[in-house]
């Protein structure tokens, strides 16, 4: 009974783990090369795809999406994980107008479960060059900013979410609440 974080080599992976542990959620970081059978044997209640440097180095994250019906749990993609989900489902990923390594104000346009109870505007920490340029079919936009039109998205039928920013970083307003909402979706809180 835990949430599994698939490590794509991002600098903030341990902060995701630390935040969830602080909330009382059993959490485990695993290499993104972990075989599907091993991940299934862990019986995760939720899966997080961490940020990282490159879409070419996301290991078995795509395989988890390919075999989603065998897991059937909420998934949250953060930064690179968000882009990976978009690309897998037929969206387009490309260079942003400018590289973002700063606080950005996002506007929540659909709170869904992940932003439940949060203010409509939040300052969040971004650290990326690429972004989702075109929403995949069957996804809806949950949040946007002036520089990035797809800051957060969700599959219309499945509990699969992506956020371009880093909820696990202290600079992000209400980041802990976003991760708490995800853990609730997973039945872990």
UniProtKB/Swiss-Prot annotation:
Pfam families: GATase (PF00117). GO terms for cellular component: cytosol. Residues 2-189 form the Glutamine amidotransferase type-1 domain. The active site is at residues 79, 166, 168. It catalyses: XMP + L-glutamine + ATP + H2O = GMP + L-glutamate + AMP + diphosphate + 2 H(+). Pathway: Purine metabolism; GMP biosynthesis; GMP from XMP (L-Gln route): step 1/1. Keywords: ATP-binding, Glutamine amidotransferase, GMP biosynthesis, Ligase, Nucleotide-binding, Purine biosynthesis. InterPro entries: Class_I_gatase-like (IPR029062), GATASE (IPR017926), GMP_synth_GATase (IPR004739), GMP_synthase_A (IPR023686). It comes from the Archaea. It is an enzyme of class 6 (ligase). Its EC number is 6.3.5.2. GO terms for molecular function: ATP binding; GMP synthase activity. The keyword GTP-binding does not apply. Heterodimer composed of a glutamine amidotransferase subunit (A) and a GMP-binding subunit (B). Catalyzes the synthesis of GMP from XMP. This is GMP synthase [glutamine-hydrolyzing] subunit A. It comes from Pyrococcus horikoshii (strain ATCC 700860 / DSM 12428 / JCM 9974 / NBRC 100139 / OT-3).
């Amino acid at each position: 009974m835990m949430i599994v974080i698939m490590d794509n080599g991002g600098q903030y992976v341990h902060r995701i783990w630390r935040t969830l542990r602080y909330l009382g959620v059993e959490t485990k970081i695993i290499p993104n090369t972990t075989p599907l059978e091993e991940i299934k044997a862990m019986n995760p209640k939720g899966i997080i795809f961490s940020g990282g440097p490159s879409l070419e180095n996301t290991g078995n994250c795509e395989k988890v999406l390919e075999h989603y019906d065998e897991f059937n749990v909420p998934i949250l993609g953060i930064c690179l994980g968000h882009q990976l989900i978009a690309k897998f489902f037929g969206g387009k990923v490309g260079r942003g107008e400018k590289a973002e390594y700063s606080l950005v104000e996002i506007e929540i346009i659909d709170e869904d479960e992940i932003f439940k109870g949060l203010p409509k505007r939040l300052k969040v920490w971004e650290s990326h060059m690429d972004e989702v340029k075109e929403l995949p079919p069957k996804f809806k936009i949950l949040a946007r900013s002036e520089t990035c039109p797809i800051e957060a998205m969700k599959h219309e039928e499945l509990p699969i979410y992506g956020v371009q920013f880093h909820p696990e970083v202290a600079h992000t307003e209400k980041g802990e609440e976003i991760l708490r909402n995800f853990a609730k979706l997973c039945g872990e809180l």
